[in-house]
């Protein structure tokens, strides 16, 4: 990416969550969505191939004991998620690599998100910045809330930890993004966000977000 790194925006944390997890953060940056019909650039496909070579079967087995994956596994348990049933994003990526014999390219946005989590252990999500109402934050779901709009919107269990803005739920923590907040391939402004759990260095979070934004910028260049 040319020029300075994008500006990090610190999100808000609900008081109850902040008291329970003082080091919990949600951080985001603005990025550009590649113009359709953008394809994953050669440099990004080559990075995926190199990363796949590093994720052998032995690495996948020991991955959970590395500091950053271990921190996410511990946090999963603290918020009621079983990391052996719902794998942390980096472990899910490692398993996908073993199943397919490599990292499968799924387009510039998904590939940039994949590179971020594989290189740093920190998962990054993307939402349509134009559909947000104010900064992102973390809070528990309220009674009667749903993920998205319309009759098919999923009901949310009260207390489940969410990524939210002033208008309501944006995504389930470490899970699905609301359909009405997902990136639109015809809109250029993306909001990339990462959730930093206790034990994850701030540098890893910044590298994940900046690296993802940089990869997306490359996707608008030569293929």
Language-model features and meaning:
Residues 1-223:
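Charge-biased, low-complexity intrinsically disordered regions
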């Amino acid at each position: 990416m040319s020029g300075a790194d994008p500006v990090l925006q610190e999100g808000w944390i609900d008081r109850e969550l902040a008291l329970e997890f003082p080091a919990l953060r949600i951080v985001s940056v603005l990025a550009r969505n590649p113009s359709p019909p953008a394809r994953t650039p050669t440099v990004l496909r080559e990075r995926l191939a190199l990363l796949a070579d590093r994720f052998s079967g032995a690495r996948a087995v020991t991955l959970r004991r590395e500091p950053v994956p271990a921190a996410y596994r511990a946090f999963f348990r603290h918020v009621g998620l079983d990391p052996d049933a719902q794998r942390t994003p980096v472990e899910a990526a490692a398993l996908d690599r073993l199943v397919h014999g490599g990292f499968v390219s799924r387009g510039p946005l998904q590939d940039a998100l994949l590179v971020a989590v594989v290189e740093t252990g920190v998962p990054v999500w993307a939402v349509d910045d134009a559909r947000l109402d104010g900064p992102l934050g973390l809070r528990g779901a309220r009674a009667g809330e749903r993920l998205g709009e319309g009759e098919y919107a999923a009901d949310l269990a009260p207390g489940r930890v969410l990524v939210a803005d002033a208008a309501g739920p944006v995504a389930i923590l470490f899970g699905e993004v609301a359909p009405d907040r997902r990136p639109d391939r015809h809109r250029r402004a993306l909001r990339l966000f990462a959730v930093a759990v206790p034990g994850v260095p701030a540098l890893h979070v910044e590298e994940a977000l900046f690296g993802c934004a940089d990869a997306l910028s490359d996707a608008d260049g030569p293929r």
